[in-house]
């Protein structure tokens, strides 16, 4: 049996964006007793970031990832978690090449084996790149440990923008228990489909716009659809404008919907909505999943729910499912169970931990 001095450590370097990592951090915090390790937070950059290879664009992109260190006796190494949208190395945003050279494992949510094999530069690191499950922004349970990063200042090299992001994490994002608690919400809406508008993602916006038009055509009544923009919408999109909802209000409205809709995120990546809708236990109709397919399509009813890549088909299938509430209920029950047994923070991170100890 290990003594306290021999207990393994997993160290998170709190030196960048953490909103996308809150899901995984909750998992690391929760799994400490089960796997007999300590989860520690260092408010500094790992030593390897001082290397000249991390200047320029690499230095900018690397802080979007989660940077960690595993220490277990003489078995010490760095690993990273990448929740970025790209499955390819488009504009060097899909992978951080210098980081791939350093870490033992590069855990990636938007894992795509074909994209890896098609890129000779990335393929060299194939064995390091490990697929992981979905995530979405969550309140971190031990948020007090992140408090020193709230106030900007020269001493901690923390900007106002980064401090604002940290405050959002503290007060804006809900706890997972809140989402699970919404599973029994009375469903008095047919559809709630309100999406952000990304000025730099024209194709994505147009697809969502076409889905909205198709929903209006086929579902027609008792629906809330539109964009919730942070700046003025193009004139032809303004008919579908919605207010920016407070986060908990947004989820309450999602929970009210009889059928939820899933569309892919930027660059055809996994949207955080996937995990959120599963956590809410909603029946889903939506686009096919492009990345990490093997992880998802083995689950009950995923082949039926994530099967439609045309806006008209999505809207028609939503209307069809609305006519069959028993089928929708079976989807909902299965999705809640899939999240609880396969995609919760604790279970998702347990797969990472088992790899670290392997």
Language-model segments: residues:
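N-terminal pre-catalytic "stem/leader" segment of glycosyltransferase-like enzymes
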Residues: 1-94, 111, 193-199, 204, ...
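Short, aromatic/basic amphipathic alpha-helical patches
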Residues: 20-32, 93-98, 116-127, 207-214, ...
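Catalytic binding pocket for nucleotide-activated donors in carbohydrate/polymer assembly enzymes
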Residues: 236-240, 247-357
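Catalytic core of nucleotide-activated saccharide and alditol-phosphate transferases
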Residues: 73-202, 209
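Catalytic donor nucleotide-activated moiety binding site of glycosyltransferases and closely related
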Residues: 209-247, 290
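Short, surface-exposed amphipathic charged segments that create phosphate/polyanion-binding patches used
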Residues: 53-58, 145-151, 238, 316-324
């Amino acid at each position: 049996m290990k003594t306290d001095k021999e207990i393994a450590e997993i160290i998170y370097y709190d030196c960048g964006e953490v909103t996308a990592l809150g899901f995984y951090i909750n998992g690391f915090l929760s799994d400490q007793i089960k796997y007999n390790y300590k989860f520690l937070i260092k408010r500094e950059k790992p030593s390897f970031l001082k290397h000249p290879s991390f200047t320029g664009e690499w230095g900018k992109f690397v802080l979007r990832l989660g940077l960690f260190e595993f220490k277990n006796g003489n078995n010490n190494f760095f690993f990273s978690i990448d929740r970025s949208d790209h499955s390819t190395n488009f504009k060097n945003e899909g992978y951080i090449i210098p980081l791939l050279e350093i870490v033992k494992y590069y855990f990636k949510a938007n894992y795509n084996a074909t994209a890896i094999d098609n890129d000779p530069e990335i393929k060299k690191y194939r064995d390091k790149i490990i697929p992981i499950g979905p995530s979405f922004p969550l309140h971190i349970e031990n948020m007090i440990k992140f408090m020193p990063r709230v106030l900007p200042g020269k001493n901690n090299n923390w900007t106002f923008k980064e401090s604002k992001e940290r405050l959002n994490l503290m007060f804006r994002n809900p706890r997972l228990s809140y989402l699970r608690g919404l599973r029994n919400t009375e469903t008095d809406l047919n559809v709630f489909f309100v999406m952000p508008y990304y000025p730099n993602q024209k194709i994505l916006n147009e697809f969502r716009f076409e889905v909205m038009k198709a929903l209006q055509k086929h579902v027609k009544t008792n629906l809330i659809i539109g964009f919730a923009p942070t700046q003025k919408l193009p004139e032809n999109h303004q008919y579908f404008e919605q207010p920016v909802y407070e986060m908990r209000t947004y989820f309450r409205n999602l929970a009210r919907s009889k059928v939820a809709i899933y569309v892919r995120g930027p660059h055809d990546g996994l949207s955080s909505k996937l995990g959120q809708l599963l956590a809410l236990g909603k029946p889903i109709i939506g686009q096919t999943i492009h990345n990490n397919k093997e992880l998802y399509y083995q689950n009950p009813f995923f082949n039926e729910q994530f099967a439609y890549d045309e806006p008209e088909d999505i809207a028609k299938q939503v209307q069809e499912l609305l006519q069959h509430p028993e089928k929708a209920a079976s989807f909902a029950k299965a999705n809640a169970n899939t999240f609880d047994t396969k995609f919760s923070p604790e279970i998702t991170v347990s797969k990472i931990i088992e790899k670290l100890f392997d």
